[in-house]
């Protein structure tokens, strides 16, 4: 808290040691929920896919390639121009875009009567007919239709939507009609379009890259395939090119991701947009794969493909220079870098069960439920803890004064007591601490047996006696406010977090159960606090 510098300068001149020790007084007593690990600075997390995309962007830029955005929605004629006779087989893998046709909407006398029944007023059909006519011609967008109908009929939007739904069923009967537009199934489709505009205008060599989505109509999604994926693709345009240029680009790019050795093999697929015998598979060795549980446990994986575009395909776009194209799937690279064996779990962790909370994440959500609201209340809680620690093993019956002082204008005395005979002031579990270890929550003593839980897990810093003391101090505060003369608070067997005045957010509790984890805080606390208020 704020302090007076002059006071401390004068105190230091008189007695530096005393001034130094007095420094503690500027540290305010904090609520237990404002103590670490419950207090911390949160930060966002990168998605592994987009983190890999960013690294790929930097890698391409570092070897002199410039970034472009290629067309994503393309006419199917481009696939036919690039693939020739193979086009139909390729188009079978493409998603075609469909649109809803704009219906011819007629306004009959019957429909006018229906509208008047809804609006409770006479309706002029001409302005309404004009709106539907403009909508049919494409002058009005569909999302503006209900607004404009409401405007000409002088009704609210809800009534306009009701009119469309009940009076004009032709809108509900519309069926999509396919167009000739497709979603790009691979980046090559976009490269031909891009290069057709710049290949004869920029100085050679032209070095471009693009990292963007492609869409492929797979039979279904599984551990290795999704309907949409990211392609990290580049082109090199020059008068003199060979397969060796592709090898050089592949090595320069992939070495930046930890790949160490490379093998190149002719691809048996022989796509028609590549010159024969130039389509090449790139195999690379990565030490992270060695000994893994995947089929790449020897460290080698097919990671990229390159080739030189065929002049028969380039000629369709009047591109007069050879073009080397290299591409790799970002998802495959990200799976290697982040250790995934299922692309669905990596791309859609929120859907495919890979949500992860660390022990620290869980520990941060374990909080004290009832907390004293005054500085005196916090001091009472601390006094209860100190008294319990000092006299925990004293034989009963026994009583120890923990605090005496003023609260809310009243004199308060707080005792830690045990009235039953032949026991101790505190039960055996009073010093158990709540610890999060490997996703589970435990209440355990700080002994050699449990050392690994404290060292490898995340201790919350809250013992059973701490949680109970805060609760007892809060009850003393409430008693003082209500002008009660006495209050007694007892703790017995602990079964749940709530028994020691702790709680955890329901979402985190569900996460632990979903992961088949456990919350085990059972133990005998047996502590009683009694307060006298005058």
Swiss-Prot record:
Keyword Zinc listed? no
Give the matching Pfam families: SepRS_C (PF18006), tRNA-synt_2d (PF01409)
Q: Which InterPro entries match?
A: aa-tRNA-synth_II, aa-tRNA-synth_II/BPL/LPL, O-Pseryl-tRNA(Cys)_ligase, Phenylalanyl-tRNA_Synthase, SepRS_C
Q: How does it assemble?
A: Homotetramer. Interacts with SepCysS.
- PROSITE patterns named in the record: AA_TRNA_LIGASE_II
The protein in question is named O-phosphoserine--tRNA(Cys) ligase
Looking up SUPFAM superfamilies in the UniProt record yields: Class II aaRS and biotin synthetases
A Gene Ontology BP annotation from the UniProt entry: tRNA aminoacylation
Q: Which residues form a coiled coil?
A: none
Instruction: Note whether Aminoacyl-tRNA synthetase occurs among the keywords.
Output: yes
Upper lineage ranks?
Archaea, Methanobacteriati, Methanobacteriota, Archaeoglobi, Archaeoglobales
Give a GO molecular function annotation for the protein: tRNA binding
Note the effect listed for residue 423 to V: Shows higher activity than the E418N/E420N mutant with both suppressor tRNA(Opal) and tRNA(Amber), and the activity with tRNA(Opal) and tRNA(Amber) is almost 30% of that of the wild-type SepRS with tRNA(Cys)
Q: Where does this protein hold substrate?
A: 186-188, 231-233, 273-274, 325
Q: Which UniProt keywords apply?
A: Aminoacyl-tRNA synthetase, ATP-binding, Ligase, Nucleotide-binding, Protein biosynthesis
Q: Which reaction does it catalyse?
A: tRNA(Cys) + O-phospho-L-serine + ATP = O-phospho-L-seryl-tRNA(Cys) + AMP + diphosphate
Q: Which Gene3D superfamilies match?
A: 6.20.250.20, Bira Bifunctional Protein, Domain 2 (3.30.930.10)
């Amino acid at each position: 808290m704020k302090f007076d510098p002059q006071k401390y300068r004068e105190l230091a001149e008189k007695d530096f040691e005393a001034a130094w020790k007095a420094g503690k007084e500027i540290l305010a007593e904090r609520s237990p929920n404002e103590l670490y690990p419950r207090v911390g600075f949160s930060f966002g997390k990168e998605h592994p896919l987009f983190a890999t995309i960013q690294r790929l962007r930097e890698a391409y830029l570092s070897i002199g390639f410039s970034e472009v955005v290629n067309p994503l929605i393309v006419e199917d004629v481009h696939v036919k121009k690039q693939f020739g006779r193979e086009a139909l087989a390729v188009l079978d893998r493409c998603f075609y875009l469909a649109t809803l046709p704009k219906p011819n909407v007629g306004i009959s006398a019957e429909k006018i009567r229906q509208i008047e029944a809804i609006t409770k007023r006479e309706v002029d059909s001409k302005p309404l007919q004009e709106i539907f006519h403009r909508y049919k011609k494409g002058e009005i967008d569909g999302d503006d239709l209900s607004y404009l109908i409401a405007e000409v009929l002088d009704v609210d939007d809800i009534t306009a939507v009701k009119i469309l739904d009940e009076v004009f069923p032709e809108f509900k009967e519309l069926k999509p009609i396919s167009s000739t537009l497709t979603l790009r199934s691979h980046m090559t489709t976009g490269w031909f379009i891009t290069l057709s505009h710049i290949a004869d205008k920029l100085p050679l060599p032209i070095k471009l890259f693009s990292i963007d989505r492609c869409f492929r109509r797979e039979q279904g999604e599984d551990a290795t395939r999704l309907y949409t994926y990211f392609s990290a693709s580049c082109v090199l345009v020059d008068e003199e090119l060979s397969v060796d240029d592709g090898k050089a680009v592949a090595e320069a790019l992939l070495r930046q991701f930890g790949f160490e050795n490379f093998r190149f093999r002719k691809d048996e697929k022989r796509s028609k947009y590549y010159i024969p015998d130039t389509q090449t598979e790139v195999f690379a060795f990565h030490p992270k794969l060695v000994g893994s549980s995947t089929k790449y446990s020897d460290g080698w994986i097919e990671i990229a493909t390159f080739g030189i575009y065929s002049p028969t395909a380039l000629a369709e776009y009047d591109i007069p220079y050879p073009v080397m194209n290299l591409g790799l799937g970002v998802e495959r690279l990200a799976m290697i870098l982040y250790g995934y064996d299922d692309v669905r779990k990596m791309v859609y962790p929120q859907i495919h069960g890979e949500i992860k909370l660390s022990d620290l994440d869980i520990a941060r959500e374990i909080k004290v439920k009832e907390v004293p609201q005054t500085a005196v209340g916090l001091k009472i809680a601390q006094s209860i803890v100190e008294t319990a620690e000092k006299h925990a093993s004293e034989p009963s019956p026994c009583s120890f004064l923990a605090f005496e002082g003023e609260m809310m204008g009243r004199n308060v005395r707080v005792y830690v007591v045990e009235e039953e005979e032949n026991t101790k002031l505190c039960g055996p579990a009073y010093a158990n601490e709540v610890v999060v270890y490997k996703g589970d929550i435990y209440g355990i003593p700080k002994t050699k047996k449990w050392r690994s839980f404290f060292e490898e897990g995340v201790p919350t810093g809250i013992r059973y006696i701490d949680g109970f003391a805060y609760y007892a101090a809060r009850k003393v505060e409430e008693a003082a406010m209500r002008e009660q003369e006495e209050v007694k608070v007892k703790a017995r067997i602990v079964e749940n977090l709530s028994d020691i005045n702790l709680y955890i957010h329901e979402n985190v509790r569900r996460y632990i159960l979903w992961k088949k984890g456990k919350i085990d805080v059972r133990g005998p606390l047996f502590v009683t606090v009694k307060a006298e208020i005058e």
